[in-house]
Amino acid sequence: MQTRDIYPESNNSYSLGTNAKRWANIHTNDLNLSNEGSTNDVDGTWGQYTIQEGEDNLYLINKRSGKKYKFLLQEVS
């Protein structure tokens, strides 16, 4: 499984892990999120976002509008 893509046979039909059997860590470059083809529970719309890392910040890019946001992070000890 070192040189293959893993993807479901049909859209929005399978989960990766369960509440009882979770993956320990996910190692990825950018994180691409989309619920296109369905709606969210808050306002009934759909979105498409990418989370990217900077040197000192995390950024959220709205792929539908092109708007970019910076996460407001507060250091904790």
Please place each PLM-identified region on the residue numbering.
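Intrinsic low-complexity, repeat-rich intrinsically disordered segments enriched
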Residues: M1-N57
